[in-house]
Amino acid sequence: MVSQLFEEKAKAVNELPTKPSTDELLELYALYKQATVGDNDKEKPGIFNMKDRYKWEAWENLKGKSQEDAEKEYIALVDQLIAKYSS
């Protein structure tokens, strides 16, 4: 179960005045999934579904990371993005 702070950061990232880069969004997605679900157990998307494939690969790269560590890293990343895009 994720913390209240994690849930607040997940909302805050959607309210940034500037959209994060594609790489930042992939990292956010992967950390969010690892924190909320755990290791990726989904089937790898087909080669022609590039967007979902990139998301799947980003999440897959976190396999073995604890949900608690992923949550902490997600919160830290959101804080960095808030500082970067809100200034």
Swiss-Prot record:
<dbReference type="GO" id="GO:0005576">
    <property type="term" value="C:extracellular region"/>
</dbReference>
<feature type="binding site">
    <location>
        <position position="74"/>
    </location>
    <ligand>
        <name>an acyl-CoA</name>
    </ligand>
</feature>
<feature type="binding site">
    <location>
        <position position="51"/>
    </location>
    <ligand>
        <name>an acyl-CoA</name>
    </ligand>
</feature>
<feature type="cross-link" description="Glycyl lysine isopeptide (Lys-Gly) (interchain with G-Cter in ubiquitin)">
    <location>
        <position position="51"/>
    </location>
</feature>
<keyword id="KW-0832">Ubl conjugation</keyword>
<comment type="function">
    <text>Binds medium- and long-chain acyl-CoA esters with very high affinity and may function as an intracellular carrier of acyl-CoA esters. Enhances the in vitro activity of the ceramide synthase complex.</text>
</comment>
<keyword id="KW-0446">Lipid-binding</keyword>
<dbReference type="GO" id="GO:0006631">
    <property type="term" value="P:fatty acid metabolic process"/>
</dbReference>
<feature type="cross-link" description="Glycyl lysine isopeptide (Lys-Gly) (interchain with G-Cter in ubiquitin)">
    <location>
        <position position="72"/>
    </location>
</feature>
<protein>
    <recommendedName>
        <fullName>Acyl-CoA-binding protein</fullName>
    </recommendedName>
</protein>
<keyword id="KW-0813">Transport</keyword>
<keyword id="KW-1017">Isopeptide bond</keyword>
<feature type="binding site">
    <location>
        <begin position="29"/>
        <end position="33"/>
    </location>
    <ligand>
        <name>an acyl-CoA</name>
    </ligand>
</feature>
<dbReference type="GO" id="GO:0036042">
    <property type="term" value="F:long-chain fatty acyl-CoA binding"/>
</dbReference>
<dbReference type="InterPro" id="IPR035984">
    <property type="entry name" value="Acyl-CoA-binding_sf"/>
</dbReference>
<dbReference type="GO" id="GO:0005737">
    <property type="term" value="C:cytoplasm"/>
</dbReference>
<dbReference type="GO" id="GO:0005634">
    <property type="term" value="C:nucleus"/>
</dbReference>
<feature type="binding site">
    <location>
        <position position="55"/>
    </location>
    <ligand>
        <name>an acyl-CoA</name>
    </ligand>
</feature>
<feature type="domain" description="ACB">
    <location>
        <begin position="2"/>
        <end position="87"/>
    </location>
</feature>
<comment type="similarity">
    <text>Belongs to the ACBP family.</text>
</comment>
<dbReference type="GO" id="GO:0042761">
    <property type="term" value="P:very long-chain fatty acid biosynthetic process"/>
</dbReference>
<dbReference type="GO" id="GO:0005829">
    <property type="term" value="C:cytosol"/>
</dbReference>
<dbReference type="Pfam" id="PF00887">
    <property type="entry name" value="ACBP"/>
</dbReference>
<dbReference type="InterPro" id="IPR022408">
    <property type="entry name" value="Acyl-CoA-binding_prot_CS"/>
</dbReference>
<dbReference type="InterPro" id="IPR000582">
    <property type="entry name" value="Acyl-CoA-binding_protein"/>
</dbReference>
<dbReference type="InterPro" id="IPR014352">
    <property type="entry name" value="FERM/acyl-CoA-bd_prot_sf"/>
</dbReference>
